[in-house]
């Protein structure tokens, strides 16, 4: 039993993380690393992100408007060219006009599909941005290595019972002298 306890203690001691040697100034000055980040820097970061988002949104709406204008101009240009050409048979004229109309409708449909996809992408981006955390996170000596939290928890929880029982004293009833029962170890 003692050998088992000894081996467990040795295993825990060997598995214990080494102290961080890269940043000795953090170990010497733990109060500096746990200082709260000023609110102004967070607001500046969020304002910068909002400005970038607005600029991107404006660029994308301009691109959509440009493509919409180009598609309508293509349809308008295609119709006069069709009229100017002299085609002898009326069946060819009707087939060309139907093709031009179908092309314009298909182009408008594609533009609507692009707008819908763009709107869905914007909604997805806004949802992602609402879940983005501020990149300024506090660093302290325990956060330098993530496995150190297992050994050094920051909040000690109240434990209502002792984690280890006293092995040296056996557990017995008050009147154990009168009973012929073996003691529990």
Swiss-Prot record:
It comes from the Eukaryota. One of its GO terms (biological process) is response to dehydroepiandrosterone. GO terms for cellular component: extracellular region; extracellular space. It is found in: Secreted. Not glycosylated. PROSITE patterns: CASEIN_ALPHA_BETA (PS00306). Keywords: Disulfide bond, Milk protein, Phosphoprotein, Secreted, Signal. Its main location: secreted. Mammary gland specific. Secreted in milk. Residues 1-15 form the signal peptide. The modification Phosphoserine is found at residues 31, 33, 41, 71, 85-86, 88-91. In milk, the alpha s1- and beta-caseins precipitate in presence of calcium (so-called calcium-sensitive caseins). Kappa-casein prevents the precipitation of the other caseins by calcium through the formation of large stable colloidal particles termed micelles. Heteromultimers of alpha-s1 casein and kappa-casein; disulfide-linked. Important role in the capacity of milk to transport calcium phosphate. Belongs to the alpha-casein family. This is Alpha-S1-casein.
